[in-house]
Amino acid sequence: MAVESAAVGVFDSGVGGLSVLREIRARLPSESLLYVADNAHVPYGEKSAEYIRERCERIGDFLLEQGAKALVLACNTATAAAAAELRERYPQVQLVAMEPAVKPAAAATRNGRVGVLATTGTLKSARFAALLDRFASDVQVFTQPCPGLVERIEAGDLYGPQTRALLERLLAPILEQGCDTLILGCTHYPFVKPLLAELIPAEMAVIDTGAAVARQLERVLSARALLASGQAATPRFWTSALPEEMERILPILWGSPESVGKLVV
């Protein structure tokens, strides 16, 4: 039986999910947090659905062994590939997943033209196709796969010339189509929002789902009387790659230095 003081487990293919973790910390400061970055297998966007599901199951099992009361799948690609299977695997655990913000973007656009930056895996998924069918039938959606962008962010290169050149190339087709709304369909991408702001029109709306995931987690925990109160424990971090590499990047993306454990699953 889960208890209020138990931690929330959050995981992603890499450090992108830290953008979601920041939103959770801001909205639910009493919640203790566990975070797993599967950096040894990043990016998920170019992997098969079967491969991603296996990784998600191993990481989910690990986080539950650490006592997590809820799981947050802070990865759009993993949600598309594995969310349904994880809900079947862990029926007793609250699972909050994420998906590209098609619904709010369709509501926000003024000219009916929406651009999407996402991984190849997300854009090819049946889940994304279903989102378009359900919420975007009245708007034009222009998708742009972004190979290489996750890797730049994983390296901590949020403002450098290579990242700028890559973003300029990725944005060009969307800007040529006159889109007035841009969906960030990967949890890594909010980390380059400041650079994006220099490359897109000031009036273009940029939408991601980190804050919405934090709100959904709050609703799920509250409905089951699992919201924590009081002082949260120090966040705990693990990576499947080199801990020292993640320790180097955490001050940049998380805002403070942290100790990182080695995940072997």
UniProtKB/Swiss-Prot annotation:
One GO MF term: glutamate racemase activity
InterPro entries hit by this protein: Asp/Glu/hydantoin_racemase, Asp/Glu_race, Asp/Glu_racemase_AS_1, Asp/Glu_racemase_AS_2, Glu_race
PROSITE patterns given in the database record: ASP_GLU_RACEMASE_1 (PS00923), ASP_GLU_RACEMASE_2 (PS00924)
Residue numbers annotated as active site: 75, 186
Binding of substrate, residues: 12-13, 44-45, 76-77, 187-188
Top enzyme category: isomerase
Keyword Cell inner membrane recorded: no
EC numbers, comma separated: 5.1.1.3
Biological process (GO), any one: cell wall organization
Keyword line: Cell shape, Cell wall biogenesis/degradation, Isomerase, Peptidoglycan synthesis
Family to which this protein belongs: Belongs to the aspartate/glutamate racemases family.
Alphabetical list of HAMAP family matching this protein: Glu_racemase
Alphabetical list of PANTHER family matching this protein: GLUTAMATE RACEMASE
Name assigned to this protein: Glutamate racemase
Protein species of origin: Pseudomonas aeruginosa (strain UCBPP-PA14)
Gene behind the chain: murI
